[in-house]
């Protein structure tokens, strides 16, 4: 996932070398949950999951408890995301908007910050 101005775009690793030069930020992780509106995962193992998605000009950040990758992909799809990427889960999952809305379960060394 790369950020360009006020938008986000998803690239597969195979096409990262051809990504535009005006990228202002990026995130790489595994697995991809949605691509072009299609669900890419089938794992049913439950846990705390976090992800980031984009669709319809909107950026979505989701923390889901007791969810599988498939559950998380379906949540993003129901919100209108066409592309979504799993982020670190478990105790690393946190959502902050002035105060913590979810987590964290431990000190976190890095964060995705949306301004």
Could you tell me what each predicted segment is?
Residues 1-115:
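Gly/Ser/Thr/Pro-rich low-complexity, intrinsically disordered segments
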């Amino acid at each position: 996932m790369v950020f360009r101005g006020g938008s986000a775009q998803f690239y597969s690793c195979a096409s990262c070398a051809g990504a535009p030069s005006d990228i202002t930020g990026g995130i790489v992780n595994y697995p991809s949950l949605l691509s072009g509106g299609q669900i890419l995962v089938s794992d049913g193992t439950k846990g705390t999951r976090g992800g980031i998605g984009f669709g319809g000009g909107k950026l979505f950040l989701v923390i889901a408890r007791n969810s599988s990758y498939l559950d998380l992909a379906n949540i993003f799809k129901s919100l209108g995301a066409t592309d979504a990427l799993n982020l670190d889960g478990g105790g690393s999952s946190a959502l902050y908007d002035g105060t913590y809305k979810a987590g964290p379960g431990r000190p976190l060394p890095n964060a995705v910050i949306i301004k």
